[in-house]
Design a protein with these regions (language model features):
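Short, conserved phosphate-binding/catalytic loop or strand-edge motifs used
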Residues: 29-31, 35
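C-terminal accessory/tail domains of diverse enzymes
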Residues: 1-24, 38-237
Length: 237
């Protein structure tokens, strides 16, 4: 898929097809996003920047990726385990990498069932356009709403593109002073301050920021006791 009108139209048509047939997106259905690893390619600094960005804001992305639900799907931890705690513990090793190829060995977290799956990345030929050479975001819930898919795709691609020209001083500060253990409440609650930090870093226009924040906030609905996906009140037109 490319950022062209015809592809977005096809996406909308697929979602409408699923909606008409009442496709079940509540029970363990994931909406994984694959983005070509060639977006970062052989740019070592871009890879380092992206990992830092993802590590710092995984808890913000998690609520956003719940999509039109305000909770995660039931078996999320089984098939998309939060990866920020693992990445955080390997930051120093990652920073010492001198080539993109060496990243594969500096980060021994190559498990497909993590929220960020790097198993498909060809670290030996990161510029190749092979459709299998992808970075996979596994946290998103499935949805039959095309706007949710558009928002998710836009966020993932903007994160990767931004990483090629990102000043990481602020992220380094966050990494030095934050707590990156997994906590269900942290990954589900509304945190406006850090959500605003994220959108100001990642997006270069107000419309993208509004779409992200609207999907992230979801009428401020929160419930930390529910262990399954629950539809949020309508916030997407």
């Amino acid at each position: 898929m490319k950022d062209k009108k015809k592809y977005w139209k096809e996406l909308k048509e697929v979602c409408e097809f699923l909606s008409k047939r009442k496709a079940d997106t509540l029970h363990n259905a994931g909406g994984h996003i694959h983005v070509g690893a060639c977006t970062l390619g052989d740019d070592l600094d871009a890879w380092k920047n992206f990992i830092k960005l993802y590590t710092v804001y995984e808890h913000i992305l998690s609520r956003f990726f719940h999509g039109d639900k305000f909770t995660a799907r039931k078996r999320i931890l089984e098939f998309a385990e939060p990866v920020a705690p693992i990445l955080y513990n390997r930051i120093d090793a990652f920073n010492s990498s001198s080539t993109v190829r060496s990243l594969k060995w500096k980060f021994p977290c190559m498990d497909r069932c993590l929220s960020l799956n790097l198993c498909n990345v060809d670290f030996h030929k990161p510029m190749c356009n092979d459709k299998k050479n992808t970075i996979e975001f596994r946290w998103p819930n499935a949805s039959s709403n095309h706007v949710i898919w558009q928002n998710n795709i836009n966020t993932c691609t903007k994160m990767l593109n931004l990483s090629k020209n990102l000043d990481t001083d602020f992220l380094d500060y966050k990494l030095s002073n934050g707590n990156f253990t997994y906590d269900k409440m942290k990954y589900s609650e509304v945190n406006i301050e850090e959500a605003l930090e994220f959108v100001d870093l990642v997006f270069d226009n107000d419309l993208d920021k509004v779409y992200f924040l609207r999907q992230y906030i979801k009428n401020y609905e929160e419930n930390f006791k529910i262990n399954k996906a629950v539809m949020a009140k309508t916030f997407v037109r």
